[in-house]
Amino acid sequence: MEPIHIIGAGLAGSEAAWQIARAGVPVVLHEMRPQVATFAHRTGDCAEMVCSNSFRSDDDRMNAVGQLHWEMRAAGGLIMAMADRHRLPAGGALAVDRDAFSQAVTQALQAEPLVSFQPGEISDLPSEGHWIVATGPLTSEALGRSIRSLTGEGSLAFFDAIAPIVHAESIDMSICWRQSRYDKGETEEERTAYINCPMTREDYEGFIDALLAADKTEFHEGETAGYFDGCLPIEVMAERGRETLRHGPMKPVGLTNAHNPAEKPYAVVQLRRDNALGTLYNIVGFQTKMKYGAQVDVFRRIPGLQDASFARLGGIHRNTFLNSPRLIDDRLRLRARPHLRFAGQVTGVEGYVESAAMGLLAGRMAAAEALGRDLPPPPATTSMGALVSHITGGADAKTFQPMNVNFGLYPPLDAMRGGRKGRKDRYPAYTDRAKADFQQWVAGES
């Protein structure tokens, strides 16, 4: 049997390779790292997480991304299995030790007899064979040119920013305290998963002034892409209004200062554990495009981080994606060249889990085709199916932008109360329907 080739061993490519091999079809995984480096990656491991170590909410009852976690587990997904194995305390979220996680994904794929690795860059889209393009937000310039040449698209892109990581030993715990927002979590470790840095109004105003005045990385001439709203740099949020951050990543709600319970902070900066040892913490929601020297100066203004030592500073990178509603069919194939499938962030989904989910589907669909079968996508009533439906036709091609999974992509339920007050009934009804429909889809595959 001819193998299926995958370009890119990120979360989507790794998941696709796993699904193809589990279906009994040989697969060749092409990865340019570490021979060809990128701005954000540090290793040549599969599924390296560069922006954050969080897969977001793990609540499969009230949250669409939590439901997506459930669906990927139900489908035997490698990414979720390794995330569960290497999870860290994070309240109601699923966060992982990113190095242990990516190493585990790599080892699982290396141990799979039907998966073979072929290192090196693919600079042109192949004209024959069965291929999945899962090159992610940091698609190489050469392959990007090949994709644009084939699709006739201009450079569709937005900018992603990366948050800094702090050495835990440099955090002043006489000022900070450990608590998850609203004390979420079933164990004491979960309920104390975050380190909180309190700010008075004076602290906050001084921080905003320094943030707005800091030197920023300038874009190259001709780079006019915008930002994805879910990953805005903090200085861009501050430019939208001085109180924006206090109602975003720095909101003080659901937290009580353990050192002074009677004093309510005006704003709070949260840090989340980044590795199993608890020696590294990332600053939650603090993506930035400030220059390195400015980052150190500005972030050390945060109470408790005045002596902070940084394991990694923030940065910014360009993220390329296809106009999928115009170019991709619901089997994730390029309409003009059906032997090419696309998966992951390059399709216009946003987020680790969403990218891996598209890899899962692309892998299963490619394997089914290689075995002489046709596999339709899951119903649009599921998180996975809602994403596919959105990127392959539900969204307007003229205004298409990357999208996280959310209940707004689900078909509405009849006779359910709308608005904010109806959520406590509506969201569980969505996820109950999604679970039943997804289980039926998985059962129909076999």
From Swiss-Prot:
Keywords: Cytoplasm, FAD, Flavoprotein, Methyltransferase, NAD, NADP, Transferase, tRNA processing. It is an enzyme of class 2 (transferase). Pfam families: GIDA (PF01134). GO terms for molecular function: flavin adenine dinucleotide binding; tRNA (uracil(54)-C5)-methyltransferase activity, 5,10-methylenetetrahydrofolate-dependent. FAD binds at residues 8-13. Its EC number is 2.1.1.74. It catalyses: uridine(54) in tRNA + (6R)-5,10-methylene-5,6,7,8-tetrahydrofolate + NADH + H(+) = 5-methyluridine(54) in tRNA + (6S)-5,6,7,8-tetrahydrofolate + NAD(+); uridine(54) in tRNA + (6R)-5,10-methylene-5,6,7,8-tetrahydrofolate + NADPH + H(+) = 5-methyluridine(54) in tRNA + (6S)-5,6,7,8-tetrahydrofolate + NADP(+). Catalyzes the folate-dependent formation of 5-methyl-uridine at position 54 (M-5-U54) in all tRNAs. HAMAP family: TrmFO. This is Methylenetetrahydrofolate--tRNA-(uracil-5-)-methyltransferase TrmFO. It comes from Paracoccus denitrificans (strain Pd 1222). The gene is trmFO.
